[in-house]
A protein has these predicted regions:
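Intrinsically disordered, low-complexity, mixed-charge
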Residues: 1-89
Length: 89
């Protein structure tokens, strides 16, 4: 079953290759969506795919790449948009 989650990751998450690492991991997991920096210093992402694969990406969001310090992750269940690929915006 395809699921989608919109996440906002707070903490030291910009300037630590969070977006590029998310892109690589999402593509490896077969998860579609996007990731972008927000003006407030957070990182926002959309993960869409098989429930187990999206769960892998949610776990990544909770830890981030080395150098990141994740303080909080806000997760919202959203309707899948039939996205293809994974982009850094």
């Amino acid at each position: 079953m395809t699921v989608a989650r919109r996440v906002v990751v707070h903490g030291r998450v910009q300037g630590v290759f969070f977006r590029e690492t998310a892109r690589r991991r999402a593509r490896r997991a077969g998860v579609a969506g996007w990731v972008r920096n927000n003006d407030d210093g957070s990182v926002e992402a959309w993960f869409e795919g098989d429930a187990d694969d999206v769960e892998v990406m949610l776990h990544f969001a909770e830890t981030g790449p080395s150098g990141a310090y994740v303080e909080r992750v806000d997760v919202e269940k959203v309707e899948p948009q039939d996205l293809r690929g994974f982009d850094v915006l």
